[in-house]
Amino acid sequence: MEQEHDWQYDLDEYIRQGEPDRSEKSAAWQIAIGLQDVDGLQTSEYLLETAKEHIEGKIDISTAQKRIYSYYELRNVRMTDEQDTMEADIVAAHIAELLAEKTFQFSPAELQSIHRRLFTGVYKTAGQFRSYNISKKEWVLNGKTVFYAAFDSIRDTLDYDFSQEKDFSYAELDVAQSIKHIAKFISGIWQIHPFCEGNTRTTAVFMIKYLQTFGFNVSNQVFADNSWYFRNALVRANYNDLQNGIHATTEFLEKFIENLLTGTNHELKNRYMHIEYTESAQSANDSTSKCKNCTLEELAILREISKNPSITQKELAEAIEKSERTIKTRTVELQNNGFLRRKNGKRNGLWEVLVEI
């Protein structure tokens, strides 16, 4: 296990050093590499060395990708194991590029574009909806399968789900309610399984980009350590076997997202999700956020303030990509609700977060 996560230790060093550009690149690479685990794939040492050079600013992301392509062209890959590593390396480099971009459009076309960009050079069908029905045996279901959408209803189903989500307002929801709704939406998109392969990695990148529109910097650690859990949680959110008392549930996915957004420490164990797991005390060590009554926007503000108590409203607006007017309104509300206070005056004072986040 230690050998598998050497890459994580190496990339963590850039975050510990505290340089913003290096930290951001390292976090993207950690998510990109960790996500390969959803399909049991591992990246190569060559990919890690290339990632380090990119993080250190010696090469840009385009050069990093070209190096990966050239590396495998020279090796003339034929063996299945090496083909899997090649896929992991290429897709990881594409994910790192996408996560660094400050662009996003909430639409089925964006989901399709993400798949195309992740898997160009890997699958001939990159960016194309599947043209046949599928089933997949799942470990967490004892070899049974989720029922995926019929291929001829993919586009209509995606259009419907996206239109419903686009019209939905999170404004009056607290964090717990927001997470439950996000889990339901994301698991629904995954259940459609619009592509032949690569659906989970595509869904993960889409979800990260979507969550960033709420002002969140998504935890790289949660995806780096728990990508397979993420997949199994999506499976359990879409599987029913009423005859045997098994119901579809988003509870596991909600725990994952809560850890991702709030720094909560739910114990994310795959065995807890297995349909034959019977122990009742699944997570005695869970630590729960005390800011469940905040909105997602308020939580994003509190997290930025906790990292930098001297942050200005202008800097807050830039950090979570909201207007200064919105920040001013929200900080006043947070102070009135007892979540935040200002010490030592407006000009030279500091913020103090009064709740655990």
Q: Which role does the model predict for each range below?
A:
Residues 1-357:
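FIC/Doc superfamily catalytic core
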